[in-house]
Amino acid sequence: MIVTNDQELEGLKKIGRIVALAREEMKRKAEPGMSTKDLDLIGKAVLDEHGAVSAPEKEYDFPGVTCISVNDEVAHGIPSTSKILKAGDLVNIDISAEFGGFYSDTGISFVLGEGEERLHKLCQCAENAFQKGLQQAKAGKRQNQIGRAVYHEARSQGFTVIKTLTGHGIGRSLHEAPNHIMNYYDPFDNALFKNGTVIALEPFISTKAETIVEAGDGWTFKTPDKSMVAQVEHTIVITKDEPIILTKL
């Protein structure tokens, strides 16, 4: 989507704030002994309160309101009453929703409790990589400069990226053009960002793996070698100056 007027921007800001509220409420209430289904219901309550609808449920019939991935699960983890969170788990919450005809997508990874130092470093690297990519998100710049910045930050910290998962355009539907915002440098991607383009920017930073495998449930992606992955995601609007982050409170 390309934002063309203030009404569209306001619509995007509304749904961006809703998913951000849900993300933060889920992170705040996550605790050892809780099932991922219980955590999902916390996100659902926030969406329901504001009249928003889960995007993966609506568009793909996903068996949950939000995606909750734990440890070596990379993305699209199905909320389950049998999946119980433990102290030290690496938890990823990815939540996208629709309100008033506009979509927004956001995600965060965190360690439940103290946990291993390397996992805290991994989460911090994901945040740093997002910020480095964000600096390249300007109208007139090449899309592939985001991937260059993200990958360089990951490697500089001793990590790598999942190359088969990418950011994407968003706005009037969950996935739009540009279809892929790579997390590594693609020399063949010469497209330039247009002013007003709305994208979900989401680095996936890994302790080792660069690819994923399906877990066997038709949805969940995991690493093939038990590597851990942290993701940070925000929906942003590209401008000629600083991008507008729609999913930051």
Swiss-Prot record:
Its EC number is 3.4.11.18. InterPro entries: Creatinase/aminopeptidase-like (IPR036005), Pept_M24 (IPR000994), Pept_M24_MAP (IPR001714), Pept_M24A_MAP1 (IPR002467). Substrate binds at H76, H175. Belongs to the peptidase M24A family. Methionine aminopeptidase type 1 subfamily. This is Methionine aminopeptidase 2. A divalent metal cation 1 binds at D94, D105, E233. One of its GO terms (biological process) is proteolysis. The keyword Chloroplast does not apply. It comes from the Bacteria. Removes the N-terminal methionine from nascent proteins. The N-terminal methionine is often cleaved when the second residue in the primary sequence is small and uncharged (Met-Ala-, Cys, Gly, Pro, Ser, Thr, or Val). Requires deformylation of the N(alpha)-formylated initiator methionine before it can be hydrolyzed. Induction: Expressed at very low levels throughout growth. Its cofactor is Co(2+); Zn(2+); Mn(2+); Fe(2+). It catalyses: Release of N-terminal amino acids, preferentially methionine, from peptides and arylamides. It is an enzyme of class 3 (hydrolase). A divalent metal cation 2 binds at D105, H168, E202, E233. Keywords: Aminopeptidase, Cytoplasm, Hydrolase, Metal-binding, Protease. HAMAP family: MetAP_1. It is found in: Cytoplasm. GO terms for cellular component: cytoplasm. Binds 2 divalent metal cations per subunit. Has a high-affinity and a low affinity metal-binding site. The true nature of the physiological cofactor is under debate. The enzyme is active with cobalt, zinc, manganese or divalent iron ions. Most likely, methionine aminopeptidases function as mononuclear Fe(2+)-metalloproteases under physiological conditions, and the catalytically relevant metal-binding site has been assigned to the histidine-containing high-affinity site. NCBIfam families: met_pdase_I. Monomer. One of its GO terms (molecular function) is initiator methionyl aminopeptidase activity. Pfam families: Peptidase_M24 (PF00557).
